[in-house]
Structure formats: C-alpha cells, structure tokens
Amino acid sequence: MTLEEREELIYRQYQEIIAPFIVELEVRDKEYPIEIFNEIRSIFTHLSRYKIQGRESDVMSAENHTQRAILDCFKYL
C-alpha cells in the first residue's frame, strides 16, 4: 500500500468509524471522551507533519493513533 493509500485509509477510518462513534457517545453520555479527542489530535498532528515533511514515520504514527482511537471508542460502548 502506498503512503497516499495509507493516508486515505486513515481519513476513511476517521469518517466511517471514529466520527460516528463520537456522535453516539455524545448523544448517549452528553460528553466528548478526552482520550478519543487526544488520539484524534495526535492523528491530525502526524498527518500534517507528513504533508509538510513527507516522512513515512508520521503516517505510521497516525495509523497507530487511529487504531488506539478506534479501541477507545469500543471501550466506551
């Protein structure tokens, strides 16, 4: 998988998995889980670094934060 495809997958996982979970959790619990927020912040920090510096390590870090955010979403259900 190319770096661009990996980047697209991160955005897709955010839109299709993480964002819907956040909506569900906000409706159910009336709050935004800080652990998920911190992972999302880290995802987009690494993606912006990748766009500026082009380092694969930032894509890898964003992928790891994406997986942790997804796991945190399931933890809250």
Language model: regions and residue ranges:
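N-terminal extramembrane/targeting module of integral membrane proteins
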Residues: 1-77
